[in-house]
UniProtKB/Swiss-Prot annotation:
Stretches that traverse the bilayer: none
Pfam families: NikR_C, RHH_1
Binding residue positions for Ni(2+): H76, H87, H89, C95
GO biological process: response to nickel cation
HAMAP family to which the protein is assigned, alphabetical: NikR (MF_00476)
Keyword check for Amino-acid biosynthesis: no
Comment on bound cofactor: Binds 1 nickel ion per subunit.
UniProt GO molecular function: DNA binding; DNA-binding transcription factor activity; nickel cation binding
Cleavable signal peptide: none
UniProt keyword annotations, A-Z: DNA-binding, Metal-binding, Nickel, Transcription, Transcription regulation
Protein name: Putative nickel-responsive regulator
Lineage top rank: taxon: Bacteria
Length: 147
């Protein structure tokens, strides 16, 4: 282990201490190690260039002019990346969607960036996990000749 000294401004130190208290860390070192690990994992996920799976989460105002149509067009244009979507009505105007994606990391990021940039999308986050590409396989189905 290495001993490291860092300098933090008062506001950042206050926020760190709040995290330590909320999560029950025994000391600041444990919290900083965990935060460093999270940052390293996030950076690795963001720079992944190979195949991955991911979850794209975003909220949007469905009453914004043409937004639902634009989102649908984007999903049809990127149909090869999208595996499933869950749609939730948060209130009269706001919707939450969670979409499971599968493909090249840069393509997933490009797709997510396009969705998040649409006017009326209020929050967006893409979480990716490196994964092996699926193997191509054939399906053989037996059919009853009498049907």
């Amino acid at each position: 282990m290495h001993r490291v000294t860092i300098t933090l401004d008062d506001d950042l130190m206050e926020k760190l201490d709040a995290i330590i208290a909320a999560r029950g860390y025994q000391n600041r070192s444990e919290a900083i190690r965990d935060l460093a690990r999270i940052g390293i994992q996030q950076t690795a996920a963001e720079t992944t260039s190979g195949h991955c799976v991911g979850a794209m989460v975003y909220t949007y105002d469905h009453s914004k002019r043409d937004l639902p149509r634009k989102l649908t067009q984007s999903f049809h244009h990127h149909h090869d990346l999208s595996r499933a979507t869950m749609h939730v009505h948060l209130d009269h105007d706001q919707c939450l969607e969670v979409t499971i994606l599968d493909g090249n990391a840069s393509e997933l990021q490009h797709f997510a960036d396009h969705i998040f940039a649409e006017r009326g999308v209020r929050y967006g986050r893409l979480v990716t996990i490196p994964a092996e590409p699926p193997e191509a396989h054939e399906h053989h189905h037996e059919h009853d000749a009498s049907s």
